[in-house]
Design a protein with these regions (language model features):
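ABC-family P-loop ATPase nucleotide-binding domain
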Residues: 1-53, 288-290
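ABC family nucleotide-binding domain
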Residues: 42-264
Length: 290
């Protein structure tokens, strides 16, 4: 470790107590998320998925997927590993090209767009593996998008990044590199980076799956506060408590299809489909045996 890194590490350790206090998000600040993320009094469909299918080689991963996301929705997608959840999210973000079907964003079929990067400015993604630039500082990770894509000036991009780093309790770590952060801290930086692009929708692909158990709560708390602020979110998750308490719609997938969807209370207390019941029973058993 270089002298500079050692000094930064010592400084970060000295700030740990302060950061833990800052992790509880300032409710006043969070209500200032850009208006595009606020919940309208009347619901408006932002994303409509119609007859979506995806085939890799001879394997049909997604089959005839249909669902809508309205402004302010928190949609949690649950299901066993390999059920197609993450592939669906990657199709919605156009990281994967659907084999068939349409994805409408404000009524426009984005599967036919020639400007996927422009679309991703409004529908951005937080990955399970963070995907931070290891050679850049925390602040630079959060300003590179606004500066390169949104063409913000340096001072403006810094101000936007600091706003959201403060929001997620990471403003004291702006000079740190990702290797100096815990998994939970990296994911909070990734969330701040996504927010800095002023998106209308954030897609979360199992954002806690790569974290140690003690780090999960801090990330879920940030996401809960964002949901309460009216940010539209689609979350692939194995965190059933989060899905039950925070989502307003839960989608259960199995074998590449949507088996059942509905309000959390209906899905978790009186699911209609046997496959849904079996999955939830397995999840409950795993939690009890953990």
């Amino acid at each position: 470790m270089t002298t500079t890194d050692a000094n930064t590490s010592r400084q970060n350790e000295e700030n740990t107590e302060q950061i833990m206090e800052n992790t509880a998000i300032d409710t006043q600040n969070i209500t200032n998320i850009d208006n595009t993320a606020q919940l309208d009094s009347q619901s408006e469909s932002i994303i409509e998925v119609r007859h979506l299918g995806k085939i890799f080689g001879t394997h049909e991963v997604l089959k005839d997927i249909d669902f809508d996301v309205q402004k302010g929705d928190v949609t949690c997608i649950i299901g066993s590993s390999g059920s197609g959840k993450s592939t669906l999210l990657r199709c919605i973000n156009l990281f994967e090209t659907p084999t068939v079907g349409e994805i409408y964003f404000h009524g426009e079929d984005v599967t036919k767009t020639k400007s996927a990067p422009k679309y991703r400015e409004k529908v951005t993604m937080v990955f399970q593996s963070f995907n931070l630039f290891n050679n850049l500082s925390v602040l630079a990770n959060c300003t590179i998008g606004p500066r390169k894509v949104l063409k913000m000036k340096k001072d403006e991009a810094n101000a936007v990044a600091m706003k959201y780093l403060e929001l997620v309790g990471m403003s004291a770590y702006i000079n740190a590199k990702p290797r100096q952060l815990s998994g939970g801290q990296k994911q909070r930086v990734a969330i701040a980076r996504a927010l800095a692009m002023s998106p209308e929708v954030i897609l979360f692909d199992e954002p806690t799956s790569a974290l140690d158990p003690e780090m999960v709560g801090e990330v879920l708390e940030v996401m809960k506060e964002l949901a309460e602020a009216g940010l539209t979110m689609i979350v692939v998750t194995h965190e059933m408590t989060f899905a039950r308490d925070v989502a307003n719609k839960v989608v259960f997938m199995d074998g590449g299809v949507i088996v059942e969807e509905g309000a959390p209370e209906q899905i978790f207390t009186s699911p209609k489909e046997e496959r849904t019941k079996a999955f939830l029973s397995r999840m409950l058993a795993e939690k009890q045996n953990a």
